[in-house]
From Swiss-Prot:
Residues glycosylated per entry: N242, N252, N279
GO biological process: lipid catabolic process
Cysteine pairings via disulfide bonds: C125-C295
Active-site residues per Swiss-Prot or TrEMBL entry: S209 (nucleophile), D355, H389
UniProt keyword Methyltransferase, yes or no: no
Pfam families, alphabetized: LIP (PF03583)
Subcellular location: Secreted
Protein name: Secreted triacylglycerol lipase LIP2
Presence of the UniProt keyword Disulfide bond in the record: yes
InterPro entries registered for this protein in UniProt: AB_hydrolase_fold, Lipase_secreted
Organism expressing this protein natively: Malassezia furfur
GO molecular function: triacylglycerol lipase activity
Length: 468
């Protein structure tokens, strides 16, 4: 079984590389020009007076060509919306961009918010940049991989909105900022009349790892901040639900780059943590400046196994997690800590018990807290020794799709608090078969295959006597 999995993954990777080589050669011969990065693109700057607009208001819009890795043009329509959102607090005016992807024959009653794990302190890694044709080739490998899953959502006939949930300050791990950005991105997408989406369309949000952190906060803030949205469910895996615990866990490991990006994001979002950047050493300034130019994998490679919470990086670094002022902020970023911030739509969580990047106990503690507070939670534990952070996302993609289909169809969720376990999702023949079909389709999409529900959406509506 494990050898067969490796064979499938190797075949997909080989096809991806071959497609990439062909597309990159063509792009080079045509002299393709790179797009301006967000900090040099005036689209990302709102016009004067934007602060008075309501959250979710569209400030600018444009049509774009959607591509993976800057060169693989997808057979879809793409739009970008600059919209008003909120910062840490409801009254803090902010703005960000969402990329809306429309497949062929899409269902106007359904919308998915795909909340990518950007996990960086660089605006160059914003999905809205990396998802455009002409962006720097293979600018963000994490983004390139996640776009493969997005095409799977599009083939279901669902419109997808992809928010830059870190916002203009690259607020990685600033959960409330990211949650607001996701909810307002959904609002903006539904407000864009050109798409024709119904104002009460069912919405599902999904995120993994750092994207799960953002999704968890969107789920938590939904009832208080954007209760009018018709959210059918939330799905998240490898969830960073306790930033305080996570920073201590990943520091001085191969994931130390996450700690550095988190410090940058938190200190740029919270005035109470601005002292971190004010007290950087020369080494710390060099590391953070470098991080501001690097996407996730580049940052991990550059900073791996270094101690970031250390006085050699910033004064007070070694006692940062004991600092009362820092803890006052960090503890507010723990999912499940506050009873007023509880998901009101069903939540599907999944996590590997041997996750080496995000501790399992952190996520299940949040699930337990939400259940105790009345939320509907299904928490799937993957117990196989081979299940780790990266492959847990990959192997659970069919489970995420099944959850979304059921939620959109209005099926019974099956109970308030559910705690199933699975050794390895691929031991399930249905999961294995679905996975193989998904990976094959993703390769076809890279070479320009039309993406969407094709005629299936129309026929479903005709058979159910709905207006096509």
């Amino acid at each position: 079984m494990f050898g067969f999995r490796l064979f499938i993954l190797a075949a997909v990777a080989l096809a991806y590389i071959q497609c990439a080589a062909a597309r990159m050669t063509v792009a080079h011969r045509l002299g393709a020009r790179s797009l301006p990065t967000p900090e040099n693109d005036p689209f990302y700057t709102p016009d004067d007076g934007w602060e008075s607009a309501a959250p979710g208001t569209i400030l600018k819009k444009r049509e774009i060509t959607v591509a993976n890795s800057g060169v693989f043009q997808y057979g879809v329509r793409g739009f970008q919306l600059l919209y008003r959102t909120s910062g840490v607090n409801r009254g803090d005016a902010s703005h960000t961009v969402t990329t809306v992807i429309i497949p062929e024959n899409y269902d106007k009653d359904k919308l998915v918010s795909a909340n990518m794990y950007e996990d960086s302190y660089s605006s160059n890694c914003a999905p809205s940049y990396s998802m455009r044709k002409g962006s720097k080739v293979f600018n963000d490998l994490a983004n390139s991989y996640q776009m493969l899953f997005i095409t799977t959502l599009l083939h279901e006939g669902w419109a997808v909105t992809v928010p830059d949930h870190e916002g203009p300050n690259n607020a990685f791990t600033s959960g409330r900022v990211e949650g607001h950005a996701i909810l307002d991105g959904i609002r903006a997408t539904l407000n864009y009349k050109k798409l024709g989406l119904n104002s009460d369309a069912k919405v599902i949000g999904y995120g993994y790892s750092g994207g799960a952190l953002a999704t968890g906060w969107a789920a938590s803030l939904h009832s208080q901040y954007a209760h009018e949205l018709n959210v059918a469910g939330w799905s998240m895996g490898g969830t960073v639900s306790n930033v305080t615990e996570w920073l201590g866990y990943i520091d001085n490991t191969t994931g130390a780059g996450f700690a550095l990006a988190s410090l940058g994001g938190l200190s740029s979002s919270y005035s109470e943590l601005a002292w971190v950047q004010d007290n950087l050493t020369s080494k710390g300034r060099r590391l953070l400046d470098q991080s501001a130019q690097n996407c996730m994998y580049q940052n991990l490679w550059a900073v791996g196994k270094q101690k970031i919470l250390d006085d050699s990086v910033f004064a007070g670094g070694s006692t940062f997690l004991q600092n009362d002022g820092a803890l006052n902020i960090l503890n507010k970023l723990t999912l499940g800590r506050f009873s007023k911030f509880v998901p009101i739509a069903p939540v599907f969580m999944f996590h590997a018990t041997h996750d080496e990047v995000v501790p399992f106990n952190m996520a299940i503690t949040t699930a337990d807290a939400w259940c105790a507070q009345g939320a509907q939670i299904k928490f799937l534990s993957n117990t196989g020794s081979e299940m780790e952070h990266t492959n847990t996302e990959l192997f659970n993609l069919p489970n995420v799709i099944f959850f979304m289909r059921d939620r959109f169809k209005g099926k019974d969720f099956g109970g308030q608090c559910q705690y199933p376990s699975s050794n390895d999702p691929w031991f399930n023949p249905q999961i294995l078969g679905t996975s193989a079909a998904i990976y094959l389709q993703q390769v076809l999409d890279l070479i320009g295959n039309r993406i969407g529900g094709h005629d299936s959406i129309l026929w479903d509506k005709v058979h159910s006597k709905q207006q096509p």
